[in-house]
């Protein structure tokens, strides 16, 4: 927890945006939460509860909420964007002319830009220009547990070490550890791919394939992360840390994960539409699976688990057929000799 306070604008009043805004407010930072839904935002501001996404959990009295974006970012020391990946580009464009001079921009969004497959730091840099400090907040963290004050560890990676440290210091506290790094590519890759792989483990558990299968999918899923990391310039140690392995294990095993719950529903025979409707929130893996495989095809590498998830989500194969294909693959060395070189 830092010894000085910042005014922080948190953009996105879903479960994760609300949790991070509450965390920052509890640490003594004047924090404003911005959202589009006027009724929900008004309720948060008046009752200090996000009844839609975090029902029954009291938010700090000091936390303010508004639908006025200009008012939210005015005089902000830095801005934290926490919107779904499909809304990220638009949100960055909206804040570009409103951002106070010198204010850095961080985000806790996980995924790629839909359509282009670009990393989110590439999108932000393209829109905001070369001089704005940027950082990505990622790691194994369920919003509900953070809001309840349960122990959590995350990591902040940025292209400006001083700004990454500012963000980490503001978040760090008695039950919330915030580390720092400078591998934005690796941090964003881990945060995106774990959502796809969580669907795979959810499907396996929904089909009651056992704990051995789950462990195998997590481990081989990590291998796929490392394989893609090796060809796009990410560092393997980033994927072996909180941004990769940590987030992967949590999302693949914790039933608070929307992506795991999607897989569970598909493994039990539900349709994709019914499963998404039942979850009732954005499920990033549906779009991210396409972008992951676009990256893999561009670089000429195989990601069999991710590809099977993509095919199941598109209705091209059944979960049973996907499992059969994975088990029938030719055996190879567990790790290529070039993976860590």
Swiss-Prot record:
Family in the record: Belongs to the NAD-dependent glycerol-3-phosphate dehydrogenase family.
UniProt-recorded name of the protein: Glycerol-3-phosphate dehydrogenase [NAD(P)+]
Reaction it catalyzes: sn-glycerol 3-phosphate + NAD(+) = dihydroxyacetone phosphate + NADH + H(+); sn-glycerol 3-phosphate + NADP(+) = dihydroxyacetone phosphate + NADPH + H(+)
Source organism of this protein record: Xanthomonas euvesicatoria pv. vesicatoria (strain 85-10) (Xanthomonas campestris pv. vesicatoria)
Active site: 194 (proton acceptor)
UniProt-listed HAMAP family: NAD_Glyc3P_dehydrog (MF_00394)
Cellular component per GO, a single term: cytosol
Binding site for NADPH: 15-16, 36, 110, 143, 258, 282, 284
Keyword Protein biosynthesis: no
PANTHER family named in the record: GLYCEROL-3-PHOSPHATE DEHYDROGENASE (PTHR11728), GLYCEROL-3-PHOSPHATE DEHYDROGENASE [NAD(+)] 2, CHLOROPLASTIC (PTHR11728:SF1)
Keywords: Cytoplasm, Lipid biosynthesis, Lipid metabolism, NAD, NADP, Nucleotide-binding, Oxidoreductase, Phospholipid biosynthesis, Phospholipid metabolism
Gene from which the chain derives: gpsA
Keyword flag Nucleotidyltransferase: no
The enzyme's E.C. designation: 1.1.1.94
Enzyme class: oxidoreductase
Binding site for sn-glycerol 3-phosphate: 110, 139, 141, 194, 247, 257-259
GO function term, MF aspect, one: NAD binding
NCBIfam families with a match to the protein in the record: PRK00094.1-2, PRK00094.1-4
Swiss-Prot/TrEMBL GO biological process terms: carbohydrate metabolic process; glycerol-3-phosphate biosynthetic process; glycerol-3-phosphate catabolic process; glycerophospholipid biosynthetic process
């Amino acid at each position: 927890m830092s010894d000085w306070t910042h005014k922080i604008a948190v953009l996105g009043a879903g479960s994760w945006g609300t949790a991070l805004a509450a965390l920052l407010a509890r640490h003594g930072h004047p924090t404003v939460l911005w959202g589009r839904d006027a009724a929900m935002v008004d309720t948060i501001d008046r009752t200090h509860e996000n009844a839609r996404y975090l029902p029954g959990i009291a938010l700090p009295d000091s936390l303010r909420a508004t639908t006025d974006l200009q008012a939210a970012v005015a005089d902000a020391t830095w801005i934290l964007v926490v919107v779904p990946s499909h809304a990220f580009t638009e949100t960055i464009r909206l804040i570009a002319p409103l951002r106070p001079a010198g204010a850095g921009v961080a985000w806790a969004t996980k995924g790629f830009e839909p359509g282009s497959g670009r990393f989110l730091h590439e999108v932000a840099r393209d829109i905001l220009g070369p001089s704005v400090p940027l950082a990505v907040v990622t790691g194994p963290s369920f919003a509900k547990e953070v809001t309840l004050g349960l122990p959590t560890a995350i990591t902040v990676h940025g292209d400006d070490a001083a700004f990454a440290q500012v963000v980490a210091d503001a978040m760090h506290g008695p039950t919330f550890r915030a580390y720092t790094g400078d591998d934005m590519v690796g941090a964003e890759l881990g945060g995106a791919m774990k959502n796809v792989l969580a669907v795979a483990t959810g499907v396996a558990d929904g089909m009651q394939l056992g704990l051995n299968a789950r462990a195998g999918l997590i481990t081989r899923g990590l291998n796929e992360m490392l394989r893609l990391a090796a060809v796009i310039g990410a560092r393997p140690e980033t994927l072996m840390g909180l941004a990769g392995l940590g987030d992967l294990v949590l999302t693949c095993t914790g039933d608070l994960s929307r992506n795991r719950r999607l897989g569970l529903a598909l493994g039990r025979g539900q349709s994709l539409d019914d499963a998404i409707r039942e979850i009732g929130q954005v499920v990033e893996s549906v779009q991210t699976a396409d972008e992951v495989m676009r990256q893999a095809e561009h670089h000429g590498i195989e990601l069999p688990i991710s590809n099977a998830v993509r095919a199941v989500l598109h209705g091209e194969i059944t979960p049973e057929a996907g499992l059969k294909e994975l088990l029938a693959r030719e055996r190879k060395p567990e790790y290529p000799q070039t993976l860590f070189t």
